[in-house]
Amino acid sequence: YKRQLKVLKGYNIRIIGLDLKKDVIEHCNQLRTRYGYDKLDFYEGDIASYKGVESVDMVVTLHACDTATDYALAKAVKWGAKVILSVPCCQHEANRTIADETLSPVMDYGILKERFAAIATDGARAKLLESKGYQTQILEFIDMEHTPKNLLIRAVKTGKPDAKAYEEVQNMSRMLNIDLTLKKLLED
């Protein structure tokens, strides 16, 4: 696909991959060398501390666990990414603190509480991106039979921040007793 963009469209493409697992990075770099992708680089590290670029056109995350998704989304906003495609994973942060007595029929059951926390987290993430000038959608990107973690947050930069979206996240956060990392990162 990268070659098609370069050859057919004339785009100057550079792709950077980050992962915390050394063996994954080594394998990806071996593939890069084998197939001659000179503008494709993989680095071992955390996106929160990555300083290799000032701006990007697109950020893609796949199953960045818990708050790693938040750090990636915040970095994408900071870099001014035109497009963000994010497949979140295990949203433990909200699950640890979420509470609301009126929702006890859900909160009293671990699996339901976990799923509710995941939905609330991803909804808040989408709204926070809207508050920073992105048009967002949450889509099912692959059939449930392949993975239960099949939601994709798609965000396209419009440059029109939505203050109401931020208020909605504030209200939900207060009601459910959650304080999401992405909200804090975007406030800095």
Sequence positions of predicted segments:
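Conserved small/polar residues in nucleotide/adenosyl-binding loops
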Residues: 1
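Short helix-capping segments at alpha-helix termini
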Residues: 5-10, 34-37
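Short beta-strand element of Class I
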Residues: 10-18
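Class I S-adenosyl-L-methionine
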Residues: 18-188
